């Protein structure tokens, strides 16, 4: 077909036929229902007494009034539904369809073999595969006849769409209206005759061909195509409509049964087209002579044994044959870029040439084209069959088996400046993931295996270090004794030390938590008195860090250091007690000079001595003690407390000078005890606490007396 014939065929009218409604299929929506009585009544009313249309309805794209592409040539109510036959006559629309069909891969595949290729018809069959009727919404005859005026027009137009909302509305395109009606087996001969009479009579009422009714453009058609992509289950509906109408029993251009995956697989078709173009370029024209490089006539080669030909089938594509070569050209020119192709010229020779000494079966073996995919076993079988021809063609030649080449030898190891060998990354990877032993440096061992013996040039490694200690807390706490450290055995170095520190052994961690909870209890808080700087704050008592395990073998030195620290505290406390005892003695001496007696003060204690052991010089003792007690009284009234033992020493010396009878007697006679009680009561009544510090001091003295 020439170019002019193709263009004239492209602008020729295209007929489309199909059902607008099926009476045996109930629609999903009530507004789409078209009963048979209503349809026949509308046809009689609009056809002026005839069951057909008197005025041609417009035919558009997706109910777009600006995209009118033709008219409805016939419409008739048949046994199964309302049938329609339309005619596409818009030149602009047909030209757009022709240009778009040239870019479509689905259209390039062509129709079924008995049909003639027609790109315009195939494009319309794939893009607008459904028919849709625009009519009034009526459910019965009474509602249809109740309207008046312009609303009495039952049908408005018929649209070409991607898929119809009513079931069974599949569109069939063709160049001949008679051929289109024959695609539907549900139409009887009488139905076809009535449709034929309508389209022949509708020629005078068709749209004027001089004025193109299509006022849209390619952008509007592209927008409609995008909308069609979002139709849910479009292909299953088209397949159902195709089976319902019965188009599957006859050949047509309908693409409803073609899946998108099969439509996009055009590799075989492109290989077929490329093979045809190569064969046409290699085959000389009729009457042309092939030039020869040698003056001698060419020798006709013997015909090789050819494999049996495959039966012709539209689904089987012929394999691409290599380009034919002239007899003067060498056979190596047709070899493929394969490692074994240079050694197997018989397998790569063209089908029309043979090699001397080769068997017919081997000489007929040809490499397939790139579009054929072979399994691995079949590929190596072909290589094995071609390898048998190598000794025949080249005596003494040995074909290499298709096995993996041996691994290259590793690079030698060179000693570095510090004496250790330089090892590459490949050697390290081989040691970890393969059975590789470096002959130059056997000191490296594989992971998860015991290391081999060291090189004799290396010195003997030192023995393992003994058990060491590791601190539990940060290194900042240097004042903590070694008893708070954790001991790690040298034999367990293979395990992680952090595992021991952070809960590796559950018993040790539990004991640490219990010790911390016991130390944080409120019962261990020390006492504080009002007026002190730390009153109201919880103060912890000093505790000795005793080994929780009960053992004392490794903590003897630490306990000794702790005992020394606590001995110093005990000495300080004892010194304070001696000072307080001296203060009480001075207050006792001061009370002897006071004549009045009162009740004993709660802050003083009486010293019990035998009453029968009284000295003869008892009258001189208060007088002798009064001179030393005057200074103490003055200091007591001034709020000064002497925290030393001088008063007790002075009183003892004065008592010694008073007479020999008092030096050998008891430390406190009965008169002195009574006088001390009276003096303390008078001092307590006469000198009240001056400030809070004095009050706290007296309370602290009373507390120490209770402890004693």
Curated annotation (Swiss-Prot):
Residue ranges, compositional bias (Basic residues): 498-513
Keyword vocabulary terms for this entry: Host cytoplasm, Host nucleus, Hydrolase, Phosphoprotein, Protease, Serine protease, Viral capsid assembly, Viral release from host cell
Positions marked as site (Cleavage) = 143-144, 209-210, 256-257, 643-644
Give the top-level enzyme category.
hydrolase
Show the InterPro entries listed in the entry: Herpes_virus_sf, Peptidase_S21
Q: What is known of its domains?
A: Region of interaction between pPR and pAP is called Amino conserved domain (ACD). The region of interaction with major capsid protein is called carboxyl conserved domain (CCD).
| Protein's name according to its UniProt entry | Capsid scaffolding protein
Task: Give the species.
Answer: Human cytomegalovirus (strain AD169) (HHV-5)
């Amino acid at each position: 077909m020439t170019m002019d014939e193709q263009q004239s065929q492209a602008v020729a009218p295209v007929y489309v036929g199909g059902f607008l409604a099926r009476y045996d299929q109930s629609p999903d929506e009530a507004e789409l229902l078209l009963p048979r009585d209503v349809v026949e009544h509308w046809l009689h009313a609009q056809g002026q007494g005839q069951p057909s249309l008197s005025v041609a309805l417009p035919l558009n794209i997706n109910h777009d009034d600006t995209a009118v592409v033709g008219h409805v040539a016939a419409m008739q109510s048949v046994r199964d539904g309302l049938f329609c036959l339309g005619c596409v006559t818009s030149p602009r629309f047909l030209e757009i369809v022709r240009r778009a069909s040239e870019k479509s891969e689905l259209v390039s595949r062509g129709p079924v073999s008995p049909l003639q290729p027609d790109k315009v018809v195939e494009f319309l069959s794939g893009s607008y595969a459904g028919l849709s009727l625009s009519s009034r919404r009526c459910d019965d005859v009474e509602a249809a006849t109740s309207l008046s005026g312009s609303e009495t027009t039952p049908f408005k137009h018929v649209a070409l769409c991607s898929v119809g909302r009513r079931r069974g509305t599949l569109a069939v395109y063709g160049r001949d209206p008679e051929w289109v009606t024959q695609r539907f087996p549900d139409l009887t001969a009488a139905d076809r005759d009535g449709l034929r009479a309508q389209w022949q009579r509708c020629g005078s009422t068709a749209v004027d061909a001089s004025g193109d009714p299509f006022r849209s453009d390619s952008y509007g058609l592209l927008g409609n195509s995008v909308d069609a992509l979002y139709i849910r289950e479009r292909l299953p509906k088209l397949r159902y409509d195709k089976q319902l109408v019965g188009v599957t029993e006859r050949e047509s251009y309908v693409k409803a049964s073609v899946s998108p995956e099969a439509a996009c697989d055009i590799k075989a078709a492109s290989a077929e087209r490329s093979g045809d173009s190569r064969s046409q370029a290699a085959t000389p024209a009729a009457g042309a002579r092939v030039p020869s490089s040698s003056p001698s006539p060419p020798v006709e080669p013997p015909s090789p044994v050819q494999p049996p030909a495959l039966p012709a089938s539209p689904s089987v594509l012929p394999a691409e044959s290599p380009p034919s070569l002239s007899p003067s050209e060498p056979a190596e020119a047709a070899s493929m870029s394969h490692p074994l192709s240079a050694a197997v010229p018989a397998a790569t020779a063209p089908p029309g040439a043979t090699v001397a000494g080769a068997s017919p079966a081997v000489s007929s073996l040809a490499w397939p084209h790139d579009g054929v995919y072979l399994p691995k076993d079949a590929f190596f079988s072909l290589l094995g069959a071609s390898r048998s021809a190598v000794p025949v063609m080249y005596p003494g030649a040995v074909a290499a088996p298709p096995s993996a080449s041996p691994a290259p030898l590793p690079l030698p190891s060179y000693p570095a400046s510090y004496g250790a060998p330089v090892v590459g990354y490949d050697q390290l990877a081989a040691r970890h993931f393969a059975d590789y032993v470096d002959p130059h440096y056997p000191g490296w061992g594989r992971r998860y295996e015991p290391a081999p013996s060291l090189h004799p040039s290396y010195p003997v490694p030192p023995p393992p270090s003994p058990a060491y200690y590791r601190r539990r807390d940060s290194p900042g706490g240097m004042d903590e004794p070694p008893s708070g450290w954790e001991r790690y055995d040298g034999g367990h170095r293979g395990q992680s030390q952090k595992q021991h520190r952070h809960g590796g052994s559950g018993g040790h961690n539990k004991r640490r938590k219990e010790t911390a909870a016991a130390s944080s209890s409120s019962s261990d808080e020390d006492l504080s008195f009002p007026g002190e700087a730390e009153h109201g704050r919880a103060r912890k008592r000093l505790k000795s860090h005793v080994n929780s395990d009960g053992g004392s073998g490794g903590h003897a030195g630490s306990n000794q250091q702790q005992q020394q620290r606590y001995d110093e505290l005990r000495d300080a406390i004892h010194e304070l007690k001696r000072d307080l005892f001296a203060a009480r003695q001075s207050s006792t001496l001061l009370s002897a000079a006071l004549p009045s007696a009162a009740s004993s003060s709660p802050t003083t204690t009486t010293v019990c001595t035998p009453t029968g052991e009284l000295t003869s010089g008892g009258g001189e003792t208060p007088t002798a003690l009064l001179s030393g007690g005057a200074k103490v009284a003055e200091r007591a009234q001034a709020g000064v407390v002497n925290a030393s033992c001088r008063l007790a020493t002075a009183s003892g010396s004065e008592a010694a000078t008073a007479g020999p009878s008092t030096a050998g007697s008891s430390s406190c006679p009965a008169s002195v005890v009574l006088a001390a009680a009276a003096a303390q009561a008078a001092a307590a009544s006469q000198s009240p606490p001056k400030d809070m510090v004095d009050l706290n001091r007296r309370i602290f003295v009373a507390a120490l007396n209770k402890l004693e």
